[in-house]
Amino acid sequence: MELWYTEKHTEYVKFSIKVDRELYTEQSKFQRIDILESKEFGKFFTLDGLMMVTEKDEFIYHDMIVHVPMATNPNIKNVLVIGAGDGGTIRELTRYKTIEKIDMVEIDERVVEVCKKYLPKTAGKLEEERVNIVYEDGLKFVRNKENEYDLIIVDSTDPFGPGEGLFTKEFYGNCYKALSEDGILVNQHESPYYEYYAKSMKDAHEKIQGLFKINKVYQAHIPTYPSGHWLFGFASKKYDPIKDLNAEAWNSLGLKTKYYNTDLHVGCFALPTYVIDMLNENKE
């Protein structure tokens, strides 16, 4: 009997991957955790049946959520990551020797433990000495922080279940307060393509836009995420991700990446017309 993983993207669209075997399943206090293995995408990790990470395409997401802000401000020293239980964002951040401290706030300790065991490719740097993992709701954690971080990365699940509070006006306001005077906020911004995800994207952008002087959106193609067309939000008190890109400084680091490069950095902010129109709806 064939086993297939299937994720519903809309009432009329489903996405499927043929599964070789199920490696692990658990119902944690917060959500269902599954690790599956496939020929096409290698091992992959889902929460409540929704795709989080595959070994084959995770590099795209993690390159883009980390290297875009780091190339914009190479002097980032203190970083807060909210979510990111699979460890891929942390892996990319630890490649920067100039970063002094990384606080990672993950609501579900079981996600981290399971990923350490089954996904060492992404979770291999979670025990690095600069990384401090706190098991707490990110919404609560950030309430008590002020002028502490140069970069906040919101590597969250979708805006329901455990990740719901990470898409609220209160949360983004507390992130603003927690950032230093030249701080940067980057978040996964959902997909603009299907109506359900597009609504979440517009809601998040509207809230961030009301707080940060500089607020932009950039994109990447991630094959296993709904529609494949995925957005990220870039918001800052000081740095413009295009005007302030220090390509020479970043390239001099000699970091080998599979997706990100400094030419792509500029190009990824050039959005399709339909996305621009959606974002402009908030201004009308």
Swiss-Prot record:
SUPFAM superfamilies: S-adenosyl-L-methionine-dependent methyltransferases. The gene is speE. Homodimer or homotetramer. Spermidine binds at residues 62, 86, 155-158. Keywords: Cytoplasm, Polyamine biosynthesis, Spermidine biosynthesis, Transferase. Pathway: Amine and polyamine biosynthesis; spermidine biosynthesis; spermidine from putrescine: step 1/1. It comes from Clostridium botulinum (strain Eklund 17B / Type B). This is Polyamine aminopropyltransferase. Coiled coil: none annotated. One of its GO terms (cellular component) is cytosol. It holds the Pfam family Spermine_synt_N. One of its GO terms (biological process) is spermidine biosynthetic process.
